[in-house]
């Protein structure tokens, strides 16, 4: 019967779509998709771009895994991203084999928890090649008031 192989093919394509949606083709695309997921409040998609052992540095604090980030700052980061506008001022990328670094300069404006926001930021992300895509293994966020 044709129905069974067709159903299996559709199911396989659906799973392949989930994988390709989670890992973007280039380091820059991965970083952009991660920020887009934060802005859209898509927790599962944002976490899919992070290695399970990601290290996130922000304001002197360290989160040592994807699970720790999910339990602590992810919700606040999504809320902040939804209520502010992040403008990319400059972005660079360096790829060396299965490792890449993306560093950015940003300007963020808007409101967060009822207070005005205007800040300049510097972001550095280290990524590792995973199959056809990239996973974020380290994030360092830093910002200052404008």
Task: List each language-model region with its residue ranges.
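Short, low-complexity N-terminal intrinsically disordered segments enriched in polar/charged residues
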Residues: 2, 9-13, 17-53, 67
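Short, conserved clusters of charged catalytic residues that mark active-site
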Residues: 29-30, 85-87, 122
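Sec/Tat-exported extracytoplasmic proteins
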Residues: 35-42, 50-54, 58, 73, ...
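A mature extracytoplasmic/lumenal domain signature
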Residues: 50, 60, 104-108, 123, ...
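Surface-exposed, charged secondary-structure patches
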Residues: 55, 71-115
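A generic structural motif
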Residues: 57, 109-111, 128, 142
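Short, mixed charged/polar active-site loops
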Residues: 62-63, 116-120
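Short beta-strand edge/turn micro-motifs at domain boundaries
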Residues: 120-146
């Amino acid at each position: 019967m044709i129905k069974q192989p067709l159903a299996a093919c559709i199911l396989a394509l659906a799973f392949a779509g989930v994988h390709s949606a989670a890992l973007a083709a280039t380091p820059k695309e991965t970083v952009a998709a991660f920020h887009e997921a934060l802005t859209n409040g898509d927790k599962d998609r944002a976490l899919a771009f992070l290695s399970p052992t990601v290290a996130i540095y922000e304001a002197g604090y360290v989160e040592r895994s994807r699970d720790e980030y999910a339990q602590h700052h992810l919700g606040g980061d999504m809320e902040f991203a939804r209520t502010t506008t992040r403008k990319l001022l400059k972005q660079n990328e360096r790829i060396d084999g299965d490792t890449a670094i993306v560093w950015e300069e940003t300007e963020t404006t808007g409101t967060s928890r009822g207070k005005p926001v205007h800040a300049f930021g510097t972001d550095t992300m280290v990524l590792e090649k995973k199959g056809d895509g990239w996973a974020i293994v380290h994030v360092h966020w830093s910002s200052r008031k404008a």
